Amino acid sequence: MTLCILTASQKSHALTAHTINIIVGSKPKVVDITAAAKKHGFILNGVFYSSSTHNLSDTNINEFDGFTKLSDFIIKNYTANDLDNSSNYDDAEGDSISHSQPFAVGQTIYQWFDNNGIRIADSDKLNIIGCGSGYAMPLTLTITTSVKTYSEYGNPNESEAVAITKLYKIASKSKLCYAKPYSTESKSGYQWVGINSADGYNWNDPNFSQPNPNNGGGYSVDYVPNWGYKANPAASSGKIFPTTGFSGAKFQLVMTGAQTDYEFSIPVNPGGNVSVDDQGYITLNDKPTGAVTINAKLIRDNNIVHQYTFDVTRMWVVPHNGKYTYDQAVQICNGQDNMLTMADLSNSPRSYDYYNLTSADHISNSYTRKIGDSVFGEWGWVTKNSYPDSNWREDPIDTATFSGRYWTKEINKTDSQWGFVVHSHDGYVVSYSFRLIGSMYNSSYANVVCKK
């Protein structure tokens, strides 16, 4: 066995197995960590992204489609092939890198954090990063691997473990996604209804998402369960939610990421009757005098401003407390012309076929969640409970005492002692006697809602 101690001037000379068997000195080192870390990355939609491949920035925010799930980012396992035997190895005594095992690479570990430094749990990995995710942007993806290197002849020949870590800033592309009626949140279990074969009601049942031509129910393609209406609807003939309104009506503009990533304001507010808070909740306090525009400015980039314009001047309604006869309703509304039609309140098929209310296929009925053609169809379950700042009736204790029945202006042509009411929670349209004919539903008395 030969012991060779090199001076600094000798370090540059090549050492081979012919001249030395063991070199006693310092440990070898893994070097140029910054360059090595650039090879950390992920595969998304079949494309490998990393700093080293120049399609992923390590200094700027990288934006991806908001419908991308965290689980769609397939983190690449770091291997010895990602290290260079020359540039990532150093030995103070000039010993060469081991031929049999140049590097030992540990497990690749990654974590996601939101912009507040809160770690995103593994159970959330199936969540999308965009619309309504609630994640403060940008996210930070941290990828790390422990690496050691080995010299050919050194004693010791194993380096200290070095962490090769890379951080990438990931964000969803900024977007205004949905306009969510407050009832979607406050009465989330009662967003849409379907009429089953037993003439009963099924709430939030996916089997009844399609509107029935005889009974109504379901929702249009513009309504997304749990999120509300699409900000850019496709089936509303260009109408934007809401097109109807009442004092205390409330909805939220749902953005990509966290609501706190945006600053909300109202640059156009004719009449000054609309307000917005820092979470993007818009409240209609009274009837605007024209179209209202809301701005949502991305705080991290003030050049990105989303605008949302709506107009509720076409149909503004005013509900009144108490139960009244039809004649009293006419007086409260200052005339029959200021009362609402069935079709104004509900887009149930019965609203357009109200003289056929007792046919076999026209028993139970309800609204369809849709933009543009009725108050209850747009706003959903409409009571004081679902819109706390409104003047609608409260939810009932039980069905028999339900008080949210609102007179419409129509009178039955074949029997002038019968009118019609619409239920505010489900859009149910039914004929209603002007005379007291029973105690269960307290016929002859109903609630009043007027136009403004």
Residue ranges and their predicted role:
Residues I109-N116, I299, I411, K452:
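Short, flexible beta-strand-to-coil junctions
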Residues G189-N196, G200, N204-P211, Y219, ...:
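Short, structured beta-strand segments at or near domain termini in extracellular proteins/domains
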Residues W316-T408:
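Conserved hydrophobic ligand-interaction patch in extracellular adhesion modules
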Residues V375-K452:
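Extracellular C-type lectin-like domains
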